[in-house]
Curated annotation (Swiss-Prot):
It is found in: Secreted. The keyword DNA repair does not apply. This is Japonicin-2. Expressed by the skin glands. GO terms for biological process: antibiotic metabolic process; defense response to Gram-negative bacterium; defense response to Gram-positive bacterium. Antibacterial activity against the Gram-negative bacterium E.coli and the Gram-positive bacterium S.aureus. One of its GO terms (cellular component) is extracellular region. Its main location: secreted. Keywords: Amphibian defense peptide, Antibiotic, Antimicrobial, Disulfide bond, Secreted.
């Protein structure tokens, strides 16, 4: 539960900020 979320959050943030992942 915890590990998948940690890997998904950074990707979601860079997409929302329109930054290169």
């Amino acid at each position: 539960f915890g590990l998948p979320m940690l890997s998904i959050l950074p990707k979601a943030l860079c997409i929302l900020l329109k930054r290169k992942c």
